[in-house]
UniProtKB/Swiss-Prot annotation:
SUPFAM superfamilies (UniProt xref): Zn-binding ribosomal proteins (SSF57829)
HAMAP family: Ribosomal_bL33 (MF_00294)
Gene of this entry: rpmG1
Protein name (Swiss-Prot/TrEMBL): Large ribosomal subunit protein bL33A
One annotated Gene Ontology cellular component of this protein: cytosolic large ribosomal subunit
Gene3D superfamilies referenced in this protein's UniProt entry, alphabetically: Ribosomal protein L33
Source organism of this protein record: Streptomyces coelicolor (strain ATCC BAA-471 / A3(2) / M145)
Length: 54
């Protein structure tokens, strides 16, 4: 597999509905499902779940 196929760049969009996003990379071999991380949303002013958007 090429480098870009194994660790693609993904967007993490806030579930609070603010439209705030984080950009990161993930390893598809270790995390084949959609990623969900709890991170700080400055627009909401609190920690919320961020879901992977491809």
């Amino acid at each position: 597999m090429a480098r870009n196929e194994l660790r693609p760049v993904i967007k993490l969009r806030s579930t609070a509905g603010t439209g705030y996003t984080y950009v990161t990379r993930k390893n598809r071999r270790n995390d084949p499902d959609r990623l969900v991380l709890r991170k700080y949303d400055p627009a909401a002013g609190r920690h919320v779940d961020f879901r992977e958007e491809r």
